[in-house]
Amino acid sequence: MNTNNLLLENKKAKFNYFIEEKISCGIVLKGTEVKSIKAKKLSFNNSFASIKKEELWLENLHVSKYKEGNIFNHDELRPRKLLIKKRELQRLKKFKEKEGYTLIPISFYLKKSIIKVEVGICKGKKLYDKREILKQKSIKKDLSREIKYK
C-alpha cells in the first residue's frame, strides 16, 4: 500500500490491539459514500468486521452524509459488505474462532481510483500493555530532549 494513496488510518487500532496480520479487501459502497470517504468524512470508532453467511461485513463504520447529496443520501451506520477471496475468508474464520481475536479496519486507501480497506486480525491489549507502551514513549521523548539540549 502506497502512503500517497492513504485516505484514512485507524490510529487507535495500533494502540488498543496487537495486529497479527493485515488483509486488503474491496468494499461495496454507494456513490455518496464514495464521495464522503474521498473527502475523509468517516469515523472508525467501535467499527469491526464480522462473518455472516459466508460473507465478510464491516459493522459500525460511520460514513458522514455527503453534503451535496439529496434525498438519496446513504444511511450513515449501515453494514457494508467487504469483498474478499473465499480462501482468505476461511483463514479469517479460523482466527475468529480462537479466543480473543477480532477483525478491525486498519485503513482506507485508493488503488487505481478504487477504495480498498485494510482489515487487521487483532488481539486486544491489556491495560498493563498499554501503560508499558506509554512509558516507553515518554522515556524516548525524554532521551531525545536531553540529547537535543546537550
Curated annotation (Swiss-Prot):
InterPro entries: SmpB, SsrA-bd_prot, SsrA-bd_prot_CS. It holds the Pfam family SmpB. One of its GO terms (biological process) is trans-translation. It comes from the Bacteria. Gene3D superfamilies: 2.40.280.10. GO terms for molecular function: RNA binding. One of its GO terms (cellular component) is cytosol. Keywords: Cytoplasm, RNA-binding. It is found in: Cytoplasm. Its main location: cytoplasm. The keyword Transcription regulation does not apply. Belongs to the SmpB family. Required for rescue of stalled ribosomes mediated by trans-translation. Binds to transfer-messenger RNA (tmRNA), required for stable association of tmRNA with ribosomes. tmRNA and SmpB together mimic tRNA shape, replacing the anticodon stem-loop with SmpB. tmRNA is encoded by the ssrA gene; the 2 termini fold to resemble tRNA(Ala) and it encodes a 'tag peptide', a short internal open reading frame. During trans-translation Ala-aminoacylated tmRNA acts like a tRNA, entering the A-site of stalled ribosomes, displacing the stalled mRNA. This is SsrA-binding protein. It comes from Borreliella burgdorferi (strain ATCC 35210 / DSM 4680 / CIP 102532 / B31). The lineage of its organism: Bacteria, Pseudomonadati, Spirochaetota, Spirochaetia, Spirochaetales. The gene is smpB.
